[in-house]
Amino acid sequence: MSTMSIDTLIGHVTRICQKNGVAHLLLIGSFATGTARKTSDIDFAVKGCKDILKLEEDLEEIETLRKIDIFDYDSIKNKYLLENIDKCGKQIY
């Protein structure tokens, strides 16, 4: 496993999401708000993903020490979480 740069990691995630037909990819959490630490995981929200389990499996193939969390925006029921994603999320595509 490697300690790749965040930009490189986002590039890998972007390609995998596009391959899986994700309509929109957003960076959320501490990396989106600029509060990430050396040990922070990296969080994404996806919109328009038909098979979230396949996407998660494909993302597990990325060789990184950082944990990657994916949230399916379309299935989130918590309105406060949705508001936070809408307010603080950084759209990748």
Set out the residue ranges of the language-model regions.
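Catalytic core of pol beta-like nucleotidyltransferases
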Residues: 1-26, 32-38, 47-93
